[in-house]
Every structure is written in structure tokens, then in C-alpha cells.
């Protein structure tokens, strides 16, 4: 179980803004209320709508996100809207009960080399599924 916390992202050597979406996933499963204050960037909470699909309870007001811990996340289709949000969706999907499908994985693949192989090597049940539409699009490009 994760312990609730309050975090404020800051420039180095403070808590890194690039880790904010991933830590938010952990705090979604913490007991109680946690608060994240984004002290570096505007619009860093774009992932929140996606993680809501998994059952997370996050309310955003400006640069502050209030997270109410839930007992479990439940698998659902989600999208990676950027690199860090994509990593957060993968983490949330691995923690969720049931299947989570992450779309727009090009963001994740751009920033995390061999992430599927590495996570599988750690025991994660994760794989890339290419849809017929994606296969057709790839064939027409190459």
C-alpha cells in the first residue's frame, strides 16, 4: 500500500515535474487524500481524464490536483497524450484489475527504449497489439 502525501514539483533539486504523472498513479492507490501542486508547468494534468477511465478520483483546480485514494483501478481503454502521461498510463494499467489498452503508444516508445521487453522481464503482463488498421498504415508507408 502506498502512503498518502503532498508533493510540489519544483526545478532541480526539487521533485521533478517529469515524474508528477507517474507518482499521481501511485497516489491514486494510496489511502486517504493526497495533493500534488505543479510548480513548474501549466497544463501538466492532461492525463487526468484518461486515468479517470480507470476509476481514479482526481480533481484538478489550476496547478493543484487533489487525489482521493481508491481501493483499485479497473482496466479500460486509455490514450497516452504525451511521454510522461503515457508512462503513467502504463503504470496505471499494470496496477489495474483487468485489461488496459493504451493507445498512442508512439509517445511511450519515443522516450522509453524497449519498455515492453523490460517490463515483461520484470514479470509484467504487457504486450504491443497492432490493429489491422495500423498494420495497413505501416505497410503503405514502407
Regions found by a protein language model. Name each.
Residues 4-142:
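Short, structured segments at the rim of ligand-binding sites
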Amino acid at each position: 500500500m502506498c502512503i498518502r502525501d503532498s508533493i510540489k514539483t519544483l526545478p532541480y533539486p526539487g521533485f521533478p515535474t517529469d515524474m508528477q504523472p507517474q507518482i499521481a498513479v501511485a497516489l491514486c492507490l494510496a489511502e486517504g487524500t493526497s495533493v500534488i501542486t505543479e510548480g513548474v508547468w501549466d497544463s501538466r494534468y492532461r492525463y487526468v481524464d484518461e486515468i479517470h477511465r480507470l476509476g481514479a478520483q482526481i480533481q484538478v483546480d489550476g496547478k493543484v490536483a487533489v487525489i482521493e485514494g481508491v481501493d483499485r483501478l479497473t482496466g479500460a481503454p486509455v490514450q497516452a497524450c504525451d511521454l510522461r502521461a503515457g508512462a503513467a498510463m502504463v503504470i496505471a494499467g499494470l496496477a489495474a484489475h483487468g485489461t488496459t489498452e493504451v493507445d498512442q503508444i508512439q509517445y511511450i516508445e519515443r522516450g522509453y527504449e524497449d519498455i515492453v521487453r523490460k517490463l515483461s522481464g520484470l514479470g509484467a503482463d504487457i504486450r504491443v497489439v497492432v490493429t489491422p488498421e495500423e498494420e495497413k498504415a505501416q505497410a503503405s508507408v514502407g
